[in-house]
């Protein structure tokens, strides 16, 4: 099986948790976050870590997001940021884009613009209890 490349956009609690899980597997991880301390912390396990704005198309392209098999838009705080990140990933030709959201309204928006999977961990955990 070929080595997969996974992009993580936003390294809050959710994004960091994904990296901690993925680093146990044979995959390349590209991470983008606007906090250099977080990128520096994970640098040993990243194929590439980029400090910058996940809504910046040129930055995502320069980071190599277009080479990813899957990208997780791990920020759910700001709908505009999530929308732009999903749109840019799809424009860059990423085959599978997963987005995290906080509300069902945001979920509908991101599904409408082309996110392949939209998850709401808080909502889903609340439903499963």
Predicted regions and their residues:
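Cytosolic regulatory regions of ion transport systems
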Residues: 1-129
């Amino acid at each position: 099986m070929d080595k997969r490349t996974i992009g993580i956009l936003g390294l809050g609690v959710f994004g960091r948790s994904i990296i901690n899980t993925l680093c146990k597997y044979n995959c390349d991880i590209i991470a983008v976050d606007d906090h250099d301390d977080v990128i520096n912390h994970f640098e040993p396990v990243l194929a590439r870590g980029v400090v910058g704005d996940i809504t910046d198309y040129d930055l995502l392209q320069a980071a190599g997001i277009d080479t990813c098999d899957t990208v997780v838009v791990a920020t759910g705080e700001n709908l505009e940021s999530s929308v732009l990140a999903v749109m840019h990933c799809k424009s860059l030709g990423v085959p599978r884009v997963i987005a995290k959201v906080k509300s069902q309204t945001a979920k509908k928006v991101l599904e409408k613009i082309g996110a392949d999977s939209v998850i709401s961990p808080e909502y889903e955990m609340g439903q499963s209890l």
